[in-house]
């Protein structure tokens, strides 16, 4: 008697859009605002990965005239982990003087997107003290922005894994990036943000695969790295250094955690060699420490 008749269910009101998507890591699987007809090979949809940022360096057009006209030169990818903090690979930003971060970008050749991109200047960067540009150990950096980005349908933050948590082998994750050297008209390679789905590869398997390459049979995979990919024809060279590798959060459809940062690869997914990524979970303590050190709460990217 204490059961409701099945023909009279209680249906809760649908959650409002805002409420549903509080917190980090929400991917817009169908894009934002408009549908792309004929989804071309590997193109991300507009706003699909709202944490994806482009890192630009500002250079004078003419070296002899440093105060003259300036160019935004594309350096690599990164991810927004807080409205004012970007996570990226150290080897792209270690030597650059003036950096700018662009969030909410999608097609670099047009400004017709329904939600605009947002640019911020980098006022402070933290490079891991053990970063080694020879072998790329600890290839991780944080960029702190002059002003927070405004959260928008095409601009959001990604979640980070709890400390030392590694994505399980076989998990299917996404790497994304533009893979091009310049923004705008001079740009070569990709104009529209690309994505590639890659499986996480177990560390030992990865090390064995890498030993078959020119790295040789004594190669040791350093603890600051993880691996993904190695499926023929799914080529991760498209991703750019510094770009995020995001994996689905179990039991939360549409929500993602950044397990890796694109670091390096041998060849291009030919002969099943996985790509190598910075292991974010392994460096979570370092990230929290540097973020908190600048008075920012790590709770934003914690799920």
From Swiss-Prot:
GO terms for molecular function: serine-type endopeptidase activity. Residues 36-292 form the Peptidase S1 domain. It is found in: Secreted. One of its GO terms (biological process) is proteolysis. Signal peptide: none annotated. SMART domains: Tryp_SPc. It comes from the Eukaryota. Its main location: secreted. InterPro entries: Peptidase_S1_PA, Peptidase_S1_PA_chymotrypsin, Peptidase_S1A, Trypsin_dom. Binds and activates processed prophenoloxidases PPO1 and PPO2 and thus is involved in the activation of the prophenoloxidase cascade probably following the recognition of pathogen-derived products. Binds the A.niger cell wall component alpha-1,3-glucan, a fungal pathogen-associated molecular pattern (PAMP) that activates the host immune response. This is Phenoloxidase-activating factor 2. It comes from Galleria mellonella (Greater wax moth). The lineage of its organism: Eukaryota, Metazoa, Ecdysozoa, Arthropoda, Hexapoda.
